[in-house]
Amino acid sequence: MTSFEIRQMWIKFFASKNHHIEKSFSLIPRNEDNLLWVNAGITPLKKYFDGTQTPSFRRITNVQKCIRTKDIKNVGKTSRHHTFFEMLGNFSIGNYFKKEAIHYAFELLTSPKWFGFPLEKLYITYFFQDQDTYQYWLDLGVNKNHLIHLKDNFWQIGPGPSGPCTEIFFDRGKTFDPRNKELIIEDLENDRFIEIWNIVFSQYNCDPKLPIEKYQELPSKNIDTGAGLERLACILQNTKTNFETDLFFPLIKALEKMTQITYTGQESFKIIADHLKTLVFAINDGAVLTNEKRGYVLKKLLRRAANEGKKLGLEKPFLYKLVPPTVAMMKDFYKELCTNQEMIAKVLLQQENIFEKTLKTAEKTFLQHLTQNTLSGKNFFKLYDTYGIPENLILDYAKKKNITTDYQKFQELLHEQQNLSKKNQTSQTNMNKQEEAFLHFLTPSEFIGYTNFACKTKVIKVFDEGIVLEKTPFYANMGGQIEDEGWIDNNKVTKITKLPNGQILHEFKGNFCEGQEVYACIDKTKRKQISYHHTATHLLEVVLQKQLGNHIKKQGSSVGFSSLRYDFNHFEKITPQTLLQIEKEVNQLIQKRVPVKIEQLSIQDAQKKYATLLEQNQKAKYKDKVRIVNIDTFSVDLCGGTHATNTKDLEHFTILSYESISSGIYRIEAVCNKNCQESLNAKLAPYQNELHQLTQKAKSLQTQNLDFEIKKFPPITKSYQDIINYQKHIKTQQQALVLFEKKVLEHHQKKMIQAESNFLPPQINKKMMLTIKEEKPLEVIKFFMNHIFYKYHLEVLFLSYVQPEKIVFLCQSKTLHAGNLIKEGVSLACGSGGGNASLAQGGTKKTQNLEKMLNFVKNKLKIN
């Protein structure tokens, strides 16, 4: 049975039991700031289990993509550890409970119509106090010797829903391990008894202060189950490990072909296959390889896989070449991979190239931090923390070079850093405790700023930091949109903050008392411009996704009065031509003059009308209602910000700048409406200043015979094209100026050589002193000196180049040490200088000391 058939059978079975089929959620969690990845089938459904949301369906089944990297070091060493895996699940939210859940599991696993496992191959664990579960399994015909009670079969992760669980194991026989069910009882790592399914009966409210038997029963009981697809495939396909199933083996075969090495269970093959799947699925879901959080996890996986490739002789980037076989292996169930295949490969190639550059410098950096063939714990930590060299790579270098490392000290320093991080988190917690007054303030305050810019209102609360109004037109700094500016009874509001329970805190200099009536008004002009920029941000995002791909996700934004800023992920630099096309398409949307519609919907209505949208907005925190901003269907998004009423209000859109702010993250700054020309002029000002300086320099170099052509700047287009034009124009002028400088230099050199007799003494000796007072570029003087030195086969040439405010001394020699001569002489002239034996330079601003220097040199050279 193929993995595709296993998934389909699971879904088909539970659909026949009236379960709603839930599509796999993104690997990037929603509403889980402290969770890097979706790591279990229940993770995206927790909102239903904790009562935060009421599900539309009480019975749910799914095949959920998951990532866990906690046991990364075990991947490849064991048969079943993976960083990416698929969890098959069935869930009941206040519907069926123990008996039905156990019956469903029994039927699906043992019925010839479904998986058809021999009953005698199944072993079941249950919580030692849970006699109901024991009896249900017994009634279904499970041998009581195959029923194992365990004290630890109880699921709880702190206060909240908890309950006993029952685990189902498949016995693969004595050939995998001669020991028997003690392997299960003692929880020993083995390849004989494979845990294939865990069913959690969520029936109690966990109270850490009480023993389990004292827990209160939940009014609504739930079922949460999870079965590992990879493990089921291993059993149903009768393979030795998960890695020989069709979920990994096509990749391993591709690696065999690439390396010309036969797979016999090598760890490197397994690690590469596992990590590559994780990378492909994570990137497909919008994750970015960075130096922080989940991005760092992915970068670590990529580098670990790349290192394993080197063990197989793959010295050049290779992971990107394995994307097509990965997609081919998984596309039957995950069709979206096909759309992003090329993008994923490009991301991996880019990151592999970056890693190669890191490796080239890493070993050199490693060697620089050694002391007597030893790497101290301090330097180990420095290489890891400051230079970003992976721990395993440092250890590999040490092993290869036979270097002793103070690994224990490194770990101590690492723990210190982690503890400091925890301490900082504690400080933040303490700070939050100090805001207890905010947390306990529950009086509602109405925001009327979507439609009103001013209102008469009343002060309902006075804090040390500011006041809360009964109703307010002020928008706080939220969702990337900056706060409003304005006044309360002619008092300038300095800061607007949203309190924990949703009210708006207004900070300013002044005194008000509770119950006092006031007049609040915002800066209407600035608010409108902010709203236009917010709508423009939505349009920009849509066009970016159209032009670059659906993998584009917002990584940060700032919607202000003077401009907007949008940060996004992408795997390569965007060309100027593409940026111009993006700008053009945003303007085309603006010129369509379509209304911006706002919908306030209940969660239930929003799920019916915009289900896909809600799934895409992984970080949205839904309450009773959601606000949808709909711009003629080409841009539909959840948004609490203020917007234009029609795209025509934006008038015009101009990109001001584009830059890379970190690996794989780019930033566009743009502007719309009447701000366009003013903002563009401000951006062009530095270029204009640079162009002016270039022009002035060129004019200063011009001679009677040589003239520099100053090209006219192209006409202003009120577009990013102006930025591009200026950049190109300056680059062209810079290149032309370099050539002109060379031409001017050659002109002066030629003229000076033609007039060399004007600078030479009447009699040419092997030791010569020259003084030049005619103003020339120093490069010309040096060229002339070198010309004279070799033309007349001199032993020593000392040249004084006298300028109004300084003197430059040059010495070229075949006999005495030029550097020593200059160094000793300029000290007498209150100057400085030096050089090597054959060439030296010095100088002084004390021009009156010229004679002292010349007399010193004459004596040294013995010139009369």
UniProtKB/Swiss-Prot annotation:
Cofactor(s) for this UniProt protein: Zn(2+)
Metal-binding listed as a keyword: yes
One GO MF term attached to the UniProt entry: aminoacyl-tRNA deacylase activity
Similarity field: Belongs to the class-II aminoacyl-tRNA synthetase family.
Record's function text: Catalyzes the attachment of alanine to tRNA(Ala) in a two-step reaction: alanine is first activated by ATP to form Ala-AMP and then transferred to the acceptor end of tRNA(Ala). Also edits incorrectly charged Ser-tRNA(Ala) and Gly-tRNA(Ala) via its editing domain.
HAMAP family the UniProt entry points to: Ala_tRNA_synth_B
Keywords, ordered alphabetically: Aminoacyl-tRNA synthetase, ATP-binding, Cytoplasm, Ligase, Metal-binding, Nucleotide-binding, Protein biosynthesis, RNA-binding, tRNA-binding, Zinc
Catalysed transformations (reactions): tRNA(Ala) + L-alanine + ATP = L-alanyl-tRNA(Ala) + AMP + diphosphate
Pfam families listed in its UniProt record: DHHA1, tRNA-synt_2c, tRNA_SAD
Name of protein: Alanine--tRNA ligase
SMART domains associated with the record: tRNA_SAD (SM00863)
Gene name, Swiss-Prot/TrEMBL: alaS
Chain positions recorded as Zn(2+) binding sites: 534, 538, 639, 643
Localization per record: Cytoplasm
GO terms for biological process, alphabetical: alanyl-tRNA aminoacylation
Gene Ontology CC: cytosol
